[in-house]
Amino acid sequence: MKQYQQYINGAWTDPESGEWFDTENPYTGEVWAKIARGNAADMDRAVAAAKQAFEGGWGTSLPSYRGKLLCRLADIIDREADRLGRLEVQDNGKLLAEMGGQTKYIGEWYRYFGGLADKIEGTVIPTDKPNMFNFTRYEPFGVVGLITPWNSPLLLVAYKLAPALAAGNTAVIKPSEFTSASTLEFMELIAEAGFPDGVVN
């Protein structure tokens, strides 16, 4: 039986509580995996790792670097789309035909924001006041929390994670306890793409 630990600071870890919960295949009702049950202590570790990664260089990293990592992740998603689609079917009961198309689209979302990362810019705001200069400058927020529902885990992670990373934020993802497996499996792709430890937890 598959067992999914938590992904915190670039490493797979057991939950602080030592507790696990079952995930069932909605088609058969059979338990097919055990998922780590996170608690406040685990969340604190994840947020601390994300904060350290943000302050340790990710927040000031070159946008072109962030864009390259996002595009690399998109390529990996394209390669793994069929497997991810089947995993989502097993985890949440969606139709394979729907998931086949949806997982192929997910890579495009990361590719789009990868291309946008080095195009985030401020603007100069005209003023009629002498000796005054108005402008906007966009900066990353820092650590962001991404809570995702059960119905389309990977797609909804993409909607939130891709723009957050492109802008220079770090993230802590809290997937639905009903469909956690695909999000946890996705962390393998994050690691393969080369994101620094703690950027995504």
Where are these regions (language model features)?
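Terminal low-complexity tails and localization/encapsulation signals of metabolic enzymes
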Residues: M1-I35, K68, R72, G122-I147
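Short glycine- and Lys/Arg-enriched binding-loop motifs that mark or flank ligand-binding interfaces
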Residues: Q6, D14, V89, R111, ...
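Histidine- and aromatic-rich ligand-binding microenvironments
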Residues: Y7, D22-N25, K34-R45, G194-N201
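Alpha-helix N-cap/helix-start motif
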Residues: E16-S17, M43, A81, M99, ...
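Glycine-rich loop-to-alpha-helix module at the N-terminal edge of alpha/beta enzyme cores
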Residues: E30-I120
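Rossmann-like NAD(P) dinucleotide-binding subdomain of oxidoreductase/dehydrogenase enzymes
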Residues: G122-N201
